[in-house]
Amino acid sequence: EIETPKNIFDEEIINLMDFNCDQRKDVHFFYTLPFSKNKALIETTWLSDLEDQSLRDYDLQLENYIENNLGIKNYKINFTEKGAIPLFAPSLSNNDKINNIGSAGGMTRLSTGYTFLNIQEHSRYIVKNIDNITEAKIFSLGKKYQFLDKVFLKVLEKHPEKMPKIFFNMFK
């Protein structure tokens, strides 16, 4: 989160995927989510191989984006965070005494990285079946969603340069 001394942001307008940045042969975009006229969350997102160390200059990327793309020279950083969402299927445990949850339990949509709603749904299921939890079924996304995620990830892997246009058309 950044804060500016002047009112710069329109808190009614968000920018979800700004691809106007260096892609480095992967998929890279920024979010700008204003909280008020002088506070906003600015986030950089990479859809890439986590092993690629050249992408790890996040602070510099954010600084360049804020100053060059948003035109903000005077700001302070209130909060920072870093995270990574795996966009691949986890290998699930074969141990019937382990009930994996979250990303480890296959609850992350591989095409979006979203996990929260699936965790909520599965948590309700676990609570409802807590007395017979060892017999409870393993969480699984529907076959349709698994297929669509695989198609998406294949296109992402083979044609990362096309992803900005694909995302734009998806949300048009």
Question: Where is each model-derived feature located?
Answer:
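Predominantly flavin-linked oxidoreductase catalytic cores and closely associated redox partners
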Residues: 1-76, 86-94
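Generic secondary-structure boundary/loop-capping signal
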Residues: 14, 82, 104-105
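FAD-binding beta-loop-beta segment adjacent to the flavin cofactor pocket
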Residues: 24-27, 82-100, 110, 155-161, ...
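Short acidic (Asp/Glu) and glycine-rich catalytic loops that position anionic groups and cofactors
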Residues: 40, 100-104, 143-147
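Conserved aromatic-histidine-acidic binding/catalytic patches
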Residues: 50, 54, 111, 155
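Flavin-binding catalytic cores
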Residues: 51-81, 92, 99, 120-144
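A conserved FAD-binding loop/helix module that cradles the flavin
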Residues: 104-125
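C-terminal helical "tail/cap" subdomain of flavin- and related membrane-associated enzymes
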Residues: 124-172
